[in-house]
Curated annotation (Swiss-Prot):
GO terms for biological process: positive regulation of rRNA processing; positive regulation of transcription by RNA polymerase I; ribosomal small subunit biogenesis; rRNA processing. This is U3 small nucleolar RNA-associated protein 15 homolog. It is found in: Nucleus, Nucleolus. Pfam families: UTP15_C, WD40. InterPro entries: U3_snoRNA-assocProt_15_C, WD40/YVTN_repeat-like_dom_sf, WD40_repeat_CS, WD40_repeat_dom_sf, WD40_rpt. There is a cross-link at K249 (Glycyl lysine isopeptide (Lys-Gly) (interchain with G-Cter in SUMO2)).
């Protein structure tokens, strides 16, 4: 008796997105760690120096987290009201932050009480930063002003009053200690020079500006507001290079990768987009559970931290290369193992027997082998199989139809079982690779269960969904045929124009057949 031949499962190519280097790079993060804060996380900032701790501004507190810690290692809570925009100095030893009451406070990382307090703003301070010389702080507030402060003397040096609405974002140049950028809800981004009493450059963003970012070289400026991210060339007097519109809601934060080759933007649409700084195309995207307010990357992009409106802080760490574990050394076989059978002399009457390889059958193959056709169909109609590997279900249905027992396998089912079959048909009937097999199965089901339609509301609903799917597919096919007919007419018209013949008379009176080339 011949052995049982397993069912051949037809495989199909997986059609998906092209795997790029960016996809591999940005997907190489572990499962995110989520930390609950006391309020919306308005700012996240990494220390530029080891061990690369990061400051989280939420509600009336500033938490300092270690790079791999889930609990704050230090907390600054000397704020009467909401704190904003905690930012590290370049050496990582000082931290500056604004507050709702208009104050600006300077902290030493090793202490708790503020070292300096700058009073001068009359409304909430939403942006602060250190200048490149480390001895000055620039701040912007809801009183429409931008101020420059001297750290050693705790005094105000300059005040700029050129904005006509809230100043909500800003940054200082990393190269020039006299230059700093501010963005406002008056739709403008301005560059100020501490050596003058007015702005030296102004660009119109077109929307309330939520975030600005200056490239380390100082040649490019990025502004975010509304659904737009715009890149400006500062060396050409603020000329607009590109305007990006890849978010569906307001863009709230910007960040640059460690190499400077990738720009990241976070938005209220719960997505973080990664752009190439050469082509300015989206090369990757992250999805989050809530609207995003803040975003920061650690040194060498080892950690990405995102703050959200629901107070959740999402922390992703890059996967480390797996170390090869040293396995215990296997004992070497004894010498007699190697010489076993070496001295055996083959005889003419010896019979050589090959050990047959044992074949392991799948459960549905075992059922088919023993003619349990209904049970085999039940196994492949399990939701786990139909969702993950629908090609197995289709192959079993095809095999049952080839044997002529598909109707027997489908008959005699209760409401729950027939619902599983109809759900699979509804989900996969419109797929071209499965359609020939499933259309035949659908016809058999309709023939079997037509007399009992109307007895079960659940089954009736499934049949109506199947009917609607078939009608929609017929409409699609009709539209495609109409489109093909129109294309055939166009192609036929073009061919006639290319080969049009006209009769022209020659000098001897006989007609000449001449073609006009289009």
């Amino acid at each position: 008796m011949a052995g049982y031949k397993p069912v051949a499962i037809q495989t199909y190519p997986i059609l998906g997105e092209k795997i790029t280097q960016d996809t591999l790079y940005w997907n190489n993060y572990k499962t995110p760690v989520q930390i609950k804060e006391f309020g919306a996380v308005s700012k996240v900032d990494f220390s530029p120096q080891p061990p690369y701790n990061y400051a989280v501004t939420a509600s009336s507190r500033i938490h300092i987290y270690g790079r791999y810690s889930q609990e704050p290692i230090k907390t600054f809570s000397r704020f009467k009201d909401t704190a904003y925009c905690a930012t590290f100095r370049q050496d990582g030893r000082l931290l500056v932050a604004g507050s709702e009451d208009g104050g600006v406070q300077l902290f030493d990382i090793s202490g708790r009480a503020p070292l300096r307090q700058f009073e001068g703003h009359t409304k909430a301070v939403h942006t602060v930063d250190f200048t490149a010389d480390k001895y000055h702080v620039v701040s912007g507030a809801d009183d429409y002003t931008v101020k420059l402060w001297d750290i050693p003397n705790s005094k105000e040096i300059l005040t700029f009053k050129e904005h006509s609405d809230y100043v909500r974002c800003g940054c200082a140049s990393k190269l020039n200690p006299d230059l700093f950028i501010t963005g406002s809800y008056d739709h403008t981004v301005k560059m100020f020079d501490a050596r003058t009493s007015e702005s030296v450059l102004s660009v119109e963003h077109g929307q309330p500006v939520e975030s600005v970012l200056l490239f380390p070289s100082g040649g490019l400026l990025v502004s975010a507001g509304g659904r737009y991210v715009k890149v400006w060339d500062m060396l050409k007097g603020g000329q607009l290079l590109v305007s990006l519109k890849n978010h569906h809601k307001t863009v709230t934060c910007l960040c640059l990768s460690s190499s400077g080759q990738r720009l990241l933007s976070g938005s209220l649409d719960r997505k973080v987009k990664v752009y190439s700084t050469t082509s300015y195309k989206v090369v990757h995207s992250f999805d989050y559970a809530a609207s995003i307010l803040s975003l920061a990357l650690a040194h060498e992009d080892e950690t990405i931290v995102v703050g959200m409106t629901n107070g959740i802080l999402s922390v992703k760490h890059r996967k480390s290369e797996a170390k090869k574990e040293s396995l215990p050394r296997r004992r070497r076989p004894a010498y007699r193992t190697f010489i076993k059978g070496k001295n055996y002399m083959k005889q003419r009457d010896d019979i050589l027997i090959n050990r047959p390889a044992k074949k392991h059958l799948e459960l549905y193959d075992r059922d088919l082998k023993h003619f349990r056709i209904s049970k085999a169909l039940d196994r492949v109609l399990d939701p786990t199989c139909t969702i993950k590997t629908p090609e197995i279900t289709v192959s079993i249905i095809k095999e049952l139809n080839r044997r002529g027992v598909l109707a027997n396998a489908l008959a005699g089912r209760d409401e729950k079982e027939i619902s599983h079959v109809l759900n699979f048909l509804i989900r996969n009937l419109s797929q071209p690779r499965f359609a020939p097999v499933l259309i035949n199965a659908a016809e058999i089901i309709i023939d079997i269960y037509l007399p009992v339609i109307g007895q079960s509301p659940v089954v009736d609903k499934k049949f109506l969904l199947l009917q609607g799917l078939v009608e929609k597919e017929i409409d699609y096919q009709r539209e495609l045929l109409e489109t093909l007919g129109m294309m055939d007419m166009l192609f036929a018209t073009m061919r006639r124009k290319e080969g049009t013949s006209v009769l022209e008379h020659t000098s001897d009176g006989f007609p000449e057949n001449k073609k006009i080339e289009s």
